[in-house]
Amino acid sequence: MAAESGKIDPMHQFMIEPLFGQGWSIAGHNIAFTNSAMWMVVTLAALLIFMIGGMKRDLVPGRWQAAVESFTGFVAGMMATNIGPEGKKFTPYVFSLFMFILIANIMGMMPTGVVGVHPFTVTSHLTVTGVLAVISFSIVLVVGFWRHGFHFFSLFVPHGTPGYMIPMIFVIELFSFLIRPFSLGLRLFVAMTAGHILMKVLAGFVINGINAGALTVAIVSIPSFILMIGITLLELLVCAIQAYVFALLTSLYLNDAINLH
């Protein structure tokens, strides 16, 4: 947390700062290695370690193997339910997407500040969530046109629509389809940003109350600290829910592309 004139800035946690390579550039664009890039690398490393550690095929699985199998089974079940047998082809992608978002969200909640390394939630930036959403949307488009050609546009005309309403319904459905990547990326970005701001604001109340004296500690700091614990637990739940929602919506969009409904 950054402080100016004794005040804590809840937005400082979202600042992207270069760690090294400040002078690196390509075509005039700076490509320094930032704290955001570092935490994405850490997230990918954690995901890789998690998967490698659980790739054993013991007859009696250990806790690590059981955890990996539980996550893969959960995503595979979701794909089978939402898409059907063909959903199995896309399970690796949706699983990777789900686990990356989940681990990135949780990494941003880790109390690494006690050892001098400030946590950074990469999913609190629209550039990251937007790219993930665009990748998913691009896959949906490729799958849809690859399987159905121009018949893919029939997705935007619900079965049984009266002929005179087709132009209007087509435009409405097409518009709702095109805003999917924006809503998908924006939802995750807003959820992670709002929760983290609230936690920092409450932390500021706690610290400023302590600095103000004993009476303020009792009136402000203690209630804020208790509330902050509750919000932190809720935010951990939000981390999992948002990863699930992102993966769920991706599977539903893939179902539209595959089954045209």
UniProtKB/Swiss-Prot annotation:
UniProt main location, coarse: membrane
UniProt keyword list: ATP synthesis, Cell inner membrane, Cell membrane, CF(0), Hydrogen ion transport, Ion transport, Membrane, Transmembrane, Transmembrane helix, Transport
Keyword Transmembrane found: yes
GO cellular component: plasma membrane; proton-transporting ATP synthase complex
Source taxon at top rank: Bacteria
TM helices/strands, residue ranges: 31-51, 64-84, 97-117, 126-146, 166-188, 201-223, 235-255
Complexes and interactors: F-type ATPases have 2 components, CF(1) - the catalytic core - and CF(0) - the membrane proton channel. CF(1) has five subunits: alpha(3), beta(3), gamma(1), delta(1), epsilon(1). CF(0) has three main subunits: a(1), b(2) and c(9-12). The alpha and beta chains form an alternating ring which encloses part of the gamma chain. CF(1) is attached to CF(0) by a central stalk formed by the gamma and epsilon chains, while a peripheral stalk is formed by the delta and b chains.
HAMAP family reported in the protein's UniProt record: ATP_synth_a_bact (MF_01393)
Name of this chain's protein: ATP synthase subunit a
Species of provenance: Rhizorhabdus wittichii (strain DSM 6014 / CCUG 31198 / JCM 15750 / NBRC 105917 / EY 4224 / RW1)
Gene name per UniProt: atpB
